């Protein structure tokens, strides 16, 4: 089993989380159902929190 460099894993995951924030928010902005749009906005907020945590960890590792 190959080991994965922590910084590489964090950078890859950060990119994924940032894409999810954009995707969820784009869907929320386009939906005509306010309840579902709000749900997608919450998803975007949660992913943004994850992205911030990952960025902080990356800064600690540098």
Regions found by a protein language model. Name each.
Residues 1-62:
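Iron-associated oxidoreductase/ferritin-like identity signal
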